[in-house]
């Protein structure tokens, strides 16, 4: 009986991924990092500032609990797999 119980405990630990955290690309360095607990959405925000005609749109990449709200003048896209918010 103890052997069966021990086997079930080991199988449970192996099957459950206790330390999993979503990873998203984050700015300013544009590198993959684990998201804080509860933040399972990766997002990309893009917008023009006064330097847009010279250097292109400003890009912000990160994690969120939910997809950020649309804002005037900002393009926001969201996804929910690891590192899915690639730089446009």
Curated annotation (Swiss-Prot):
<feature type="disulfide bond">
    <location>
        <begin position="67"/>
        <end position="78"/>
    </location>
</feature>
<dbReference type="GO" id="GO:0090729">
    <property type="term" value="F:toxin activity"/>
</dbReference>
<comment type="function">
    <text>Binds with high affinity to muscular (alpha-1/CHRNA1) and neuronal (alpha-7/CHRNA7) nicotinic acetylcholine receptor (nAChR) and inhibits acetylcholine from binding to the receptor, thereby impairing neuromuscular and neuronal transmission.</text>
</comment>
<feature type="signal peptide">
    <location>
        <begin position="1"/>
        <end position="21"/>
    </location>
</feature>
<feature type="disulfide bond">
    <location>
        <begin position="35"/>
        <end position="63"/>
    </location>
</feature>
<keyword id="KW-0964">Secreted</keyword>
<dbReference type="InterPro" id="IPR003571">
    <property type="entry name" value="Snake_3FTx"/>
</dbReference>
<keyword id="KW-0732">Signal</keyword>
<keyword id="KW-0800">Toxin</keyword>
<keyword id="KW-0008">Acetylcholine receptor inhibiting toxin</keyword>
<dbReference type="Pfam" id="PF21947">
    <property type="entry name" value="Toxin_cobra-type"/>
</dbReference>
<keyword id="KW-1015">Disulfide bond</keyword>
<dbReference type="GO" id="GO:0005576">
    <property type="term" value="C:extracellular region"/>
</dbReference>
<comment type="similarity">
    <text>Belongs to the three-finger toxin family. Long-chain subfamily. Type II alpha-neurotoxin sub-subfamily.</text>
</comment>
<dbReference type="InterPro" id="IPR045860">
    <property type="entry name" value="Snake_toxin-like_sf"/>
</dbReference>
<dbReference type="GO" id="GO:0030550">
    <property type="term" value="F:acetylcholine receptor inhibitor activity"/>
</dbReference>
<feature type="disulfide bond">
    <location>
        <begin position="24"/>
        <end position="42"/>
    </location>
</feature>
<keyword id="KW-0528">Neurotoxin</keyword>
<protein>
    <recommendedName>
        <fullName>Long neurotoxin LNTX-1</fullName>
    </recommendedName>
</protein>
<keyword id="KW-0629">Postsynaptic neurotoxin</keyword>
<feature type="disulfide bond">
    <location>
        <begin position="79"/>
        <end position="84"/>
    </location>
</feature>
<dbReference type="InterPro" id="IPR054131">
    <property type="entry name" value="Toxin_cobra-type"/>
</dbReference>
<feature type="disulfide bond">
    <location>
        <begin position="48"/>
        <end position="52"/>
    </location>
</feature>
<dbReference type="InterPro" id="IPR018354">
    <property type="entry name" value="Snake_toxin_con_site"/>
</dbReference>
<dbReference type="GO" id="GO:0099106">
    <property type="term" value="F:ion channel regulator activity"/>
</dbReference>
<keyword id="KW-0872">Ion channel impairing toxin</keyword>
């Amino acid at each position: 009986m103890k052997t069966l119980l021990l086997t079930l405990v080991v199988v449970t630990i192996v099957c459950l991924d206790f330390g999993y955290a979503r990873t998203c690309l984050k700015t300013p360095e544009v590198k993959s990092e684990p998201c804080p607990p509860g933040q399972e959405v990766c997002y990309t925000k893009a917008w023009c500032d006064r330097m847009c005609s010279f250097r292109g749109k400003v890009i912000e990449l990160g994690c969120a609990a939910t997809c950020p709200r649309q804002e005037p003048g900002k393009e926001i896209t969201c996804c929910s797999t690891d590192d899915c918010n690639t730089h446009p």
